[in-house]
Amino acid sequence: MATSHFTTPLAVDTIQTPPRRKTLSTPPDTPVYNDLDNESPAPKTAQKSIIEFPYDLEIARDSNGAYVEFGRGVWSTVYKATSSMSTGRPMMMMTPPSSPVIATSTSRVVAVKTPLRRDAHSILRAEAYILSRVASTSPTSGAVDQEGGYVVPFYGYIPSSNALVLQALPLSLSAHIETCAGQARKSFSTRTMFDPVTPNWRGLATQLIKGLDWLHTEVGIVHGDIKPHNVLLRPRQSPSSLQKGGEMEYDALYTDFSSAHFISSCTSTDDFPTGEGALTPPFAAPELLTLSAMKSATCLSTPASDIFALALTLLAAATGDVLVYAGTSAMQRLAMSREGWRALDYVRSGANASRLGRGRDGYVGMVVQKGIAREAESRPTAREWLDIFA
């Protein structure tokens, strides 16, 4: 199989953090989750229930014969590939549960996420376990290419190469924000200066908050590393979904679950450690960046820290500054991220303050402010956050 071996290198200023938070430089151990349907199975059980990819793959090459990459991250490289997937053929599971069926054409382009190094093998296997649970929970899991959904469709895991196969969606929210920001600078006017640089910002915010609510309440997982680079955009195809009441022309879908864990796994003991991969200033919540948090032996990322990360992702989409704190170094961003609840104060003093909306408490500012409350317990749940859009 073409994906069995890769030796070649998607993150921005990412801090790698181990499950026990002993140092910032050591990579995490294997993520093992102790919750399946609110039970605590033995570790060998946690290794099951993974959707397996049963089809052949061929990695795409450019004119020079090099593999074509969609992107790179802390643990992995994402390659462009093609696969012949028989129409209606079900994906295989490592355990008996019923399998989603992929409605396919003869050949399609897919994304193949492969480990960069040996210690990433367990990280990707754990991500495959998370994505298999997501796929089995999704109402669109039986037809993963249709519109809707909240997560990039997962086609399966390849055990021989520790690779994940997903729907190919080359456009990230971060790239879209940068494109929109460039266009906004070229066409700046007093008529539009109070609008977010990303068109249909409200629709984007609604999609992502609904998706986060679904992940937290229906699937029962924390994403752990939400940022513009970990949201992919899929163009909507049906005419009825376009130009309809100012809705987004894209489905905004979460990707990269290498730092995800089940919410109930935070009560795990030392027998069932939870692995978390990366924290990305400025999107990491301040409580995750304290010295005591780094030394903690328990789960750090929570639904509340996901809310914070999404709030700053939406702030970036409004201002056009993908890293929020424009013109700062990585060390400066880290220092400012430790007081991330002040992010709006920084933006208000900068060139893009008008993008928050008219007045000090403009619409964008109001939405973001709720999500970046200093104390985690003061932040709304995703469902409560949606009330702003009612």
Regions found by a protein language model. Give the residues of each.
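Activation segment signature within eukaryotic-like protein kinase domains
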Residues: 204-205
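Juxta-kinase regulatory segment immediately upstream of eukaryotic protein kinase catalytic domains
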Residues: 2-69
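Conserved HxN/HPN-centered segment at the entrance to the catalytic loop
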Residues: 136-157
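ATP-binding glycine-rich loop module of kinase domains
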Residues: 74-136, 140-141
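Conserved structural core of kinase catalytic domains
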Residues: 152-196
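A conserved short helix/loop substructure at the end of the activation segment
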Residues: 372-384
